[in-house]
Amino acid sequence: MKTLYSLRRFYPVETLFNGTLSLGGRDQETTGFAWWAGNARLINLSGKLLGAHVAHAGLIVFWAGAMNLFEVAHFVPEKPMYEQGLILLPHLATLGWGVGPGGEVIDTFPYFVSGVLHLISSAVLGFGGIYHALIGPETLEESFPFFGYVWKDKNKMTTILGIHLILLGAGAFLLVFKALYFGGVYDTWAPGGGDVRKITNLTLSPSVIFGYLLRSPFGGEGWIVGVDNLEDIIGGHVWLGSICIFGGIWHILTKPFAWARRAFIWSGEAYLSYSQGALSIFGFTACCFVWFNNTAYPSEFYGPTGPEASQAQAFTFLVRDQRLGANIGSAQGPTGLGKYLMRSPTGEIIFGGETMRFWDLRAPWLEPLRGPNGLDLSKLKKDIQPWQERRSAEYMTHAPLGSLNSVGGVATEINAVNYVSPRSWLSTSHFVLGFFFFVGHLWHAGRARAAAAGFEKGIDRDTEPVLSMTPLN
């Protein structure tokens, strides 16, 4: 493969502890990168880079399969999923596999099948990764020109982008087909308690779907995180899948316009930085989704959201004290506001106390008690059902709180059972990963831009103090 520029010009870092260390033509002398720079040594070896990526995919899928089987092996059907530290089975249950009314697990075999399928897939990917890393051609350009590429080839790069977009679109449509034709998905809002149902009446109105993107990110609006029905979620995936597929076809058939050629840096490291920027946004969005949304992430599987646990506690004590004779409509709390009920700034009747900040929570166990103007006092006095009391007591004691200081009034107990909500795990991990990807995006974008501008020098070693010191040995 012809190299269009001197590697040294772009990768001039020249510090190797052992200058003779050679890695099969992938040493520092030939690539400009030391062993610890990992895949950077493979920038111009498309065959070996393919091996690294396939092997990486194998590791990801192996984790999914192994962890899936680990969760199946440890699963106790009598306990809720969120009490058992599970993060994969809740996703499978949300897709409608193995669960029945109320989110009760009736069959764990689909979970076992999922784990085995992922393990088998990981073996295939692992073999492919090892083959391309060790045996296959170092570069693909000569033998398989369709799979070969030069990083500067703008047309080829947008073709690869298009292929990726089509695959993402197909993934979005897999969820649509599951919800429409293959057994449906779990709907926490199904009448009479959550249940698996086919989503028939999709929301395809662009004003509704794209309206989410224009909403405020705060409060009950919550940008796209505020979606509260499966019709909108599945309809959104129809739109998203269609846009990805048509965008992919567009990028395969067209060449980048002049403004795009000028605006972007066209190098491997630049593409890495763009991808990390996208993954960072995904991570932060997923963090907010799993923390606040109880439709895409049903509380039956993931445990209550923070606001949900807080409102559940207010409801639980309202029920208790009403039974003991309290007049919940007029009792005054220590601040002079209503102890059990008060009014929101816009006049709705809401729960009183510290949970007032979560007044715009919506949850399946609470909505039946609302009227046209917030909570309905007569329903609270006459219509509370035993299942609502049980659900709120359960959620009150399973708040997704670590050692937070501000817990929305939820009673915290230092000697409580060792419980960490999957919402805590998933939102924290995705926030941290989103942040790290953002830092990686800045780092690689800066390096790529500097290299393109021609002043990427690495660290100047000539004036380093260590050079004038006595060797340690």
From Swiss-Prot:
The modification N-acetylthreonine is found at T15. One of its GO terms (cellular component) is photosystem II. The modification Phosphothreonine is found at T15. GO terms for biological process: photosynthetic electron transport in photosystem II. Coiled coil: none annotated. Keywords: Acetylation, Chlorophyll, Chloroplast, Chromophore, Manganese, Membrane, Metal-binding, Phosphoprotein, Photosynthesis, Photosystem II, Plastid, Thylakoid, Transmembrane, Transmembrane helix. One of the components of the core complex of photosystem II (PSII). It binds chlorophyll and helps catalyze the primary light-induced photochemical processes of PSII. PSII is a light-driven water:plastoquinone oxidoreductase, using light energy to abstract electrons from H(2)O, generating O(2) and a proton gradient subsequently used for ATP formation. This is Photosystem II CP43 reaction center protein. It comes from Angiopteris evecta. The lineage of its organism: Eukaryota, Viridiplantae, Streptophyta, Embryophyta, Tracheophyta.
